[in-house]
């Protein structure tokens, strides 16, 4: 009897110890762990969809955020509205809202890092489009962070001026310190160059090679690398040439579509969020007339259609 009990005890222990391995192999219920390029593309297309809906102001500014930046600039005169709720005159009234941009941009960076570090498929056409877009999008987010949260870039002091915490892989426990601005700029440039290696041409991914080059031109301009800024700007202009005055006016005022020489735009799909943002921006901006000093900077010649295209006789 004791021998039988001993055998049963040993069998039970063996079963329990064997089960421990399976017990530790936990997979979260209700969540899909990406494996294929198609599954990783859903991570990326979430952000691309937000841009097209005009629901994300941190990557590509949507109408409401763009109008807000105009309110804080020096191009508009004091409000004509009886209420100042939606037509702020002073950036300090919204200064705390800028903090939201920081975690939002790093959230996009996190998703890009997940794709870059973990997607096994690197050879299929879809995988190349996904990787090229992820590299470009990550650098654009860091470029936006560099502009918003760091001192204006000066090459002479870039090694002594604080830049950004640089994260190149998904690690929830990582706490990177801030790099200097030169290191940040080099990190951004590396991402752009990696994006160009994939030569994305599928416009469904928004950030094609030409769009990446356009952002590179802006990045080089911001970091005062004038020679490279000119090189990349010329490359982009070959694909998106300047238009004649009438054609430009028609293209720039198109709603829910990207004009002929518009490189990238938000709010290109009709939806409730984007439509509300557009309506609010339109109703608010007409309450602030353009400053007379700005109007006087434009020519009155037929070839300069900026004045006629941007505001009316009441300067709105």
What does each model-found stretch correspond to?
Residues 127, 181, 204-205:
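Short coil/turn linker motifs that delimit alpha-helical repeat modules in TPR/alpha-solenoid proteins
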Residues 1-28:
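Bacterial Sec-dependent N-terminal signal peptides
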């Amino acid at each position: 009897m004791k021998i039988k009990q001993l055998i049963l005890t040993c069998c039970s222990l063996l079963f329990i110890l064997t089960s421990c391995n399976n017990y530790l192999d936990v997979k979260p219920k209700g969540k899909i762990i990406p494996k294929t390029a198609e599954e990783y593309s859903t991570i990326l297309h979430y952000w691309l969809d937000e841009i097209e809906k005009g629901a994300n102001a941190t990557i590509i500014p949507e109408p409401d955020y763009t109008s807000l930046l105009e309110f804080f600039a020096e191009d508009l005169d004091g409000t004509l509205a009886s209420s100042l709720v939606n037509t702020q005159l002073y950036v300090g009234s919204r200064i705390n809202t800028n903090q939201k941009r920081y975690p939002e941009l790093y959230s996009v960076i996190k998703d890009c890092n997940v794709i870059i570090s973990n997607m096994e498929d690197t050879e299929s056409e879809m995988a190349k489009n996904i990787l090229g877009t992820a590299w470009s999008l990550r650098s654009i987010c860091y470029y936006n962070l560099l502009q918003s949260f760091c001192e204006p870039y000066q090459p002479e002091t870039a090694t002594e001026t604080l830049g950004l915490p640089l994260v190149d892989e998904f690690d929830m426990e990582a706490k990177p310190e801030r790099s200097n601005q030169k290191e940040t700029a080099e990190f951004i440039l590396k991402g752009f160059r990696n994006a160009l290696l994939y030569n994305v041409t599928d416009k469904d991914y928004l950030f094609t090679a030409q769009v990446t080059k356009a952002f590179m031109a802006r990045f080089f301009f911001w970091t005062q690398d004038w020679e490279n800024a000119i090189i990349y700007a010329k490359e982009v202009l070959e694909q998106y040439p300047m238009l004649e005055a009438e054609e430009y006016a028609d293209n720039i005022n198109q709603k829910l579509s990207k004009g002929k020489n518009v490189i990238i735009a938000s709010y290109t799909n009709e939806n409730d969020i984007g439509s509300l943002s557009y309506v609010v921006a339109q109703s608010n901006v007409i309450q602030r007339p353009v400053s007379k000093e700005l109007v006087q900077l434009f020519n009155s010649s037929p070839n300069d259609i900026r004045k006629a295209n941007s505001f009316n006789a009441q300067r709105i």
